[in-house]
């Protein structure tokens, strides 16, 4: 029996977010109002008004998550009651392990799956799982190599299946639905895995046990953390992402309850409801939905099924992009997909929480052009003399408050680890963890404004016909040539130099306040090259800076 009160929780959370938003807006007004408000400052206030809901939501999720992480003996169970009711052991139901592949290196894909199948067999649960390799590979030569690799892999494994489509209609969502329509038989659940996903047998068995404990669960999405990375870029990025997702997902799960997220992989899904309710038709403009996962989640919610998040990171991993160019391309794909949600907001048959989820996904990327506009308007205002009466201390306080809220997920995750010694111990102790946190903060302070500018440029180009496909991802860790970095990032560099010079002509104080947001743009090319440099990667690994528990466990 649970005592969740969705209305009360959401009202309390809404009040917290509103209070944070009002504080941010008051601090901004307090900084800009003295001496009169110029036209540029009015536009800045408008942009701040639009980005503040996301910043306040981030801070609210982080504070609630941190409170649960510090105050509960079992944080995942505190926000997912079915976890406490789950029966450990061999499951009753048959579950498909559905791995979506397209033009992948099977020598990288298959070994983690072999370990998973072997460990499930060792737990005497092997006959309860069926591995399905769902291929959308179109290239004939790659398909032949793929089929040969799977055939060798399947020798001696009776529970391995392989299916390749000749037409990849509907992309990944269509791949999964084709499996459910034409190939699934007695499987009650399926666990979605990407080609770079890694899950342990313990994590898989826990997901099935949770689903069996609550027959109204449609999806349970587990937290996903980065696989141990060699390259500096993913190593630093995912160290902070891991800390941030821990607090964010815990806080969000507390108030979203049965209206949780689905991120497309490392999740368990009940087959029949998904097949009935999560089928995706074309958008009103005729295009296919790119970011399918959130839409599938809100469809199940609208049909009365529970979608929950399991904010536990153990045994659920993925590979992050190996370098800055791949990361930016992935962001562009996600941004293009999330912007499609504008068309879905007008459609009927979504719950209020479902629409809120879609709106959050839009705000995640819509904030980029708004933050870029704030920086550009601030430079124009400073050069034109509009900021002459602005008290710098008040402005610095407002900027710092927004910075705290923007980065609050990872900051609260860092606080959790440093305050709880047993968490920091998994990273080598508090000192080792603090070194990783400081390195990540320094790197991301340079990279985040650059990433924001890149998203802003991409989103601004979407109405003019720019498109991004869902091409196979480069997962190989490699260096970046200076020429390649310059060709990709010269616009970002020029914008950064122009903004920095603009603030420098006003005053040293203006330059000092702007540098945290422009320096990464100025250094875009070397930052891209250095973060992929094998020498820097080796230096970080040798000193175990930003090492994860999985890396330390195998070293």
Over which residues does each language-model region extend?
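Cytosolic juxtamembrane regulatory segments of multi-pass membrane proteins
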Residues: 80-103, 434-447, 480-485, 529-555
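N-proximal low-complexity "stem/linker" segments adjacent to membrane-targeting elements
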Residues: 4-110
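Internal catalytic domains of large membrane-associated glycosyltransferases
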Residues: 60-63, 67-347
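Basic/Trp-rich segment in TM-proximal cytosolic loops or flexible interdomain/linker regions
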Residues: 1-17, 33-42, 71, 75-80, ...
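Composition- and surface-driven signal marking solvent-exposed, interaction-prone regions
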Residues: 41, 111-112, 192, 205, ...
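Transmembrane-cytosolic junction motif
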Residues: 62-79, 419-422, 529-540
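C-terminal amphipathic alpha-helical interaction region
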Residues: 474, 482-555
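Alpha-helical membrane-embedded segments
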Residues: 45-68, 404-407, 514-533
């Amino acid at each position: 029996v649970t005592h969740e009160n969705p209305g009360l929780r959401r009202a309390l959370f809404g009040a917290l977010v509103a209070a944070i938003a009002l504080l941010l807006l008051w601090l901004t007004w307090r900084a800009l109002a003295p001496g009169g408000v110029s036209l540029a400052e009015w536009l800045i206030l408008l942009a701040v008004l639009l980005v503040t809901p996301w910043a306040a939501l981030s801070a609210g999720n982080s504070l609630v998550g941190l409170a649960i992480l510090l105050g509960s003996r079992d944080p995942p169970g505190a926000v997912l009651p079915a976890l406490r009711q789950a029966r450990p052991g061999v499951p009753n139901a048959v579950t498909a392990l559905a791995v979506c592949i397209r033009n992948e290196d099977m020598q990288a894909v298959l070994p983690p799956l072999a370990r998973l199948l072997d460990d499930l067999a060792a737990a005497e649960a092997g006959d309860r799982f069926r591995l399905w390799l769902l291929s959308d590979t179109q290239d004939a030569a790659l398909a032949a190599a793929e089929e040969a690799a799977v055939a060798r892999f399947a020798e001696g494994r009776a529970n391995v299946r392989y299916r390749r489509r000749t037409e990849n209609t509907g992309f990944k969502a269509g791949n999964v639905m084709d499996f459910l329509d034409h190939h699934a038989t007695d499987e009650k659940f399926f666990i979605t895995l990407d080609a770079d996903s890694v899950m342990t047998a313990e994590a898989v068995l826990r997901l099935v046990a949770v689903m069996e404990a609550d027959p109204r669960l449609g999806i349970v999405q587990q937290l996903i953390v980065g696989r141990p990375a060699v390259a500096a870029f993913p190593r630093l990025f995912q160290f902070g992402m891991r800390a941030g997702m821990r607090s964010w997902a815990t806080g969000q799960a507390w108030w979203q309850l049965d209206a949780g997220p689905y991120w497309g992989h490392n999740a368990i899904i009940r087959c029949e409801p998904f097949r009935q309710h999560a089928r995706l038709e074309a958008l009103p403009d005729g295009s296919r939905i790119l970011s399918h996962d959130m839409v599938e989640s809100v469809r199940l919610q609208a049909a009365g099924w529970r979608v929950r998040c399991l904010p536990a990171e153990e045994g659920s991993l993925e590979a992050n992009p190996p370098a800055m160019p791949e990361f930016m391309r992935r962001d562009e794909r996600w941004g293009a997909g999330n912007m499609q949600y504008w068309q879905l907001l007008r459609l009927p048959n979504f719950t209020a929480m479902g629409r809120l989820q879609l709106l959050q996904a839009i705000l995640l990327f819509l904030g980029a052009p708004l933050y870029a506009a704030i920086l550009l308007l601030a430079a124009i205002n400073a050069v034109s003399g509009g900021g002459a009466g602005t008290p710098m201390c008040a402005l610095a306080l407002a900027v710092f408050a927004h910075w705290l809220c923007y980065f609050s997920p990872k900051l609260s995750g860092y606080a959790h680890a440093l305050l709880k010694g047993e968490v920091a111990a998994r990273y080598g102790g508090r000192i080792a963890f603090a070194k990783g946190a400081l390195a990540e903060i320094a790197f991301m302070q340079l990279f985040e404004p650059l990433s924001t500018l890149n998203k802003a440029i991409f989103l601004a180009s979407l109405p003019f016909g720019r498109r991004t496909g869902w091409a196979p991802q480069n997962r190989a860790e490699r260096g970046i040539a200076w020429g390649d970095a310059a060709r990709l990032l010269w616009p970002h560099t020029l914008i950064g130099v122009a903004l920095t010079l603009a603030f420098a002509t006003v005053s040293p104080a203006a330059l000092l306040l702007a540098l945290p947001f422009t320096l990464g743009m100025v250094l875009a090319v070397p930052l891209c090259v250095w973060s992929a440099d094998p020498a820097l990667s080796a230096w970080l690994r040798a000193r175990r800076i930003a090492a994860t528990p999985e890396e330390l466990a195998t070293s």
